[in-house]
Amino acid sequence: MKKLLLALALSAGFVASAQAQLTGNLGLTSDYRFRGVSQTQNAPAVQGGIDYAHKSGLYIGNWNSSVSSQVYTSGAGLESDLYAGYKKEIFKGITVDVGSYNYFYPRATTTARTGSDFNTYEAYVGLSHGDHITAKYSRTLGDGYFGTANAQGTTYMQADGKLPVPVIKNLAVVAHYGRTNVANSSTLDYNDINAGLVYSLPKSLDVSVKYFTNTGTTRTFETANTVSGQKLYKNAVVVGLTKTFN
């Protein structure tokens, strides 16, 4: 009987592992840009995360990056994100993705300008066609939006595209458009755009080169922090290297 129970337990463990996938990633970037805005005062960042995806479509993950302690005042120089959601193919090649994404900035103090901390909580829904086209809508659940108070209901809409270059193997053109609408502060609304190339190397390495621009103003990016004289929104070319672990 004990042997039978042991066999069943081992079998259950094998099935569970076969139905789930654990992956990790580690990256370097010349400038960490989030929705068009530099999080590192135009300086390099180290990034990495881990994802657990089940065959059912449920997933959970954590992603981290170094950030500027001047942008995120008196913080630990770290952004640590937690997210969870559900993905399902609803038509051939069309996948729906719903979930929650939560941004945390350990020890970052509340900002004098807004009275709100930087931690931000969002719900999202997205549609994608393979890895070629993605449309996503995110909405802030809490009162604060990265240091801007009274911002519950702030939305971010984005469209992303990725197309392989036929004449060069493993090379793809990528493009992104995003629109931020800050609740109760329409003067902070802006668009962000980036486009570039991604080249896949052996051993799950990707190299990217992208050009970033947006329509934001100085006020947009200095409202939520104490940085002055820093063009966190300026046009820039950003180079990145990412390694994926399966």
Task: List the predicted regions and their residue ranges.
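Cleavable N-terminal export/targeting peptides
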Residues: M1-Q21, N246
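Structural signature of outer-membrane beta-barrel channels/translocons
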Residues: G13, D51-G57, K87-E89, G126-H132, ...
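Repeated loop/turn-to-beta-strand initiation elements of outer-membrane beta-barrel proteins
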Residues: L22-G24, S56-I60, K92-V98, D131-Y137, ...
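Surface-exposed loop and membrane-interface regions of Gram-negative outer-membrane beta-barrel proteins
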Residues: L58-D117
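Outer-membrane beta-barrel "beta-signal"
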Residues: L163, A195, Y199-L205, Y211, ...
